[in-house]
């Protein structure tokens, strides 16, 4: 695929994968592993692909090279889905040099038993790789989302090679009916979201560049309305809500708490609120995390289980904390048969999160819904709708 006259796409699509990084469901739309070629007087290849697709990738590269020989392999990120082809590339093209950060070369020793000492070129912030007619200026992007990561900027065609930044779930040969944001959001908050301050740092560097195209390592090449993508990443990485709305995440066993959640959702919608509801035992938890970060309010609803909260709720709260959940209003709904304690437990688990505001009101369901707990639902719906 031609991105510009001299920059080509040679990535691959994976339709066999079911779980990305062993946990994120991509069974419906697959995954893309992106790689690029910059054709100057010298030729640079940007990143490789996952181990199962190295032969296909090398075939794509040969087609674009059209008899020429690459001079450089630029490694922006060492995660195996982007670095598995390094050794095969270096063997096939013995005159090529490998360009990466010092941190990436240290990782190469761990993965390949060598850092290709006779052929390596270590780059850092501000270094320039001159290809003749094109050049790559390197931008340090540590912890977006691994410590060795670098971005690069090609100044002739004004292209940012952004490693895992601006990536999304889904293969590139399938059109996503939901557009970019939904699966990009799930990808960001699942994989990159913990490292918001590092994303903020690299966005500040990118603000000084004239960027016309963004080439990430997953998902589509971004060529239009780039301000939208940059602004969205700024919102996500600063942990600000993207939209007004309420996510309800619940864990119910016999249906009594589920009934309370359904009544609360209906009461909120009747008050004009946008509501998304997740059964944590059955729904995709990554989507629940995504919406918890997307909206400005969150309801946590759990049964009391062995004096604690239900395991999937504990996992959900832990995942939010692990990804630096903050700047939100949170309400609690609990249930129990004789001594409800879930709200107390959830309150304690939320204590370590930054700028979390608990609502004044909560809902307690003792056994099943009754007039008292229904009244609490109405009061909480009023507070959440202010």
What are these regions (language model features)?
Residues 172-214, 218-221, 263-278, 288-386:
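FMN-binding flavodoxin-like domain, especially the glycine-rich phosphate-binding loop
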Residues 37, 151-215, 223-250:
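Metal-dependent phosphodiesterase/nuclease catalytic metal-binding core
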Residues 2-5, 100-149, 195-201:
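Metallo-beta-lactamase
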Residues 41, 52-99:
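Active-site metal-binding motif and surrounding structural segment of the metallo-beta-lactamase
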Residues 2-62, 151-154, 158-162, 257:
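Conserved beta-strand hairpin/beta-sheet module of binuclear metal-dependent hydrolase folds
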Residues 249-271:
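Short, charged N-terminal beta->alpha structural module
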């Amino acid at each position: 695929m031609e991105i510009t006259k001299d920059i080509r796409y040679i990535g691959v699509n994976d339709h066999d994968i079911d779980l990305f990084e062993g946990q994120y469901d991509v069974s419906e739309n697959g995954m893309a592993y992106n790689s690029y070629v910059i054709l100057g007087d010298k030729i640079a290849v940007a990143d490789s692909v996952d181990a199962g697709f190295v032969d296909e990738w090398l075939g794509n590269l040969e087609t674009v090279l059209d008899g020429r020989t690459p001079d450089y392999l630029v490694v922006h990120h060492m995660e195996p889905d982007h670095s598995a082809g390094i050794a095969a590339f270096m063997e096939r093209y013995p005159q090529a040099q490998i360009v990466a950060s010092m941190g990436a070369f240290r990782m190469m020793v761990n993965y390949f038993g060598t850092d290709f000492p006779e052929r390596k070129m270590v780059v850092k912030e501000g270094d320039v790789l001159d290809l003749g007619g094109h050049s790559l200026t390197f931008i340090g992007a540590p912890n977006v989302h691994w410590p060795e990561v670098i971005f690069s900027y090609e100044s002739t065609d004004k292209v940012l090679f952004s490693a895992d930044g601006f990536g999304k779930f889904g293969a590139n040969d399938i059109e996503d009916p939901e557009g970019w944001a939904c699966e990009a959001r799930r990808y960001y908050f699942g994989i990159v979201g913990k490292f918001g301050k590092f994303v903020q740092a690299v966005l500040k560097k990118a603000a000084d560049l004239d960027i016309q195209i963004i080439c990430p390592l997953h998902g589509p090449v971004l060529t239009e309305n780039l301000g939208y993508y940059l602004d969205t990443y700024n919102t996500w990485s600063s942990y600000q809500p993207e939209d007004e709305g309420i996510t309800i995440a619940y864990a119910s066993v016999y249906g009594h708490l589920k009934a309370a959640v359904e009544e609360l959702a209906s009461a909120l919608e009747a008050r004009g609120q946008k509501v998304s509801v997740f059964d944590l035992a059955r729904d995709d938890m990554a989507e629940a995390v995504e919406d918890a970060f997307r909206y400005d309010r969150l309801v946590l609803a759990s049964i009391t289980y062995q004096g604690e909260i239900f395991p999937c709720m504990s996992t959900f709260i832990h995942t939010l904390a692990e990804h630096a959940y903050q700047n939100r209003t949170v309400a609690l709904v609990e249930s129990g048969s004789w001594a409800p304690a879930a709200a107390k437990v959830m309150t304690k688990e939320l204590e370590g999160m930054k700028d979390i505001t608990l609502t004044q009101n909560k809902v307690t369901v003792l056994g099943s819904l009754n007039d008292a707990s229904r009244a609490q639902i109405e009061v909480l719906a009023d507070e959440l709708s202010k």
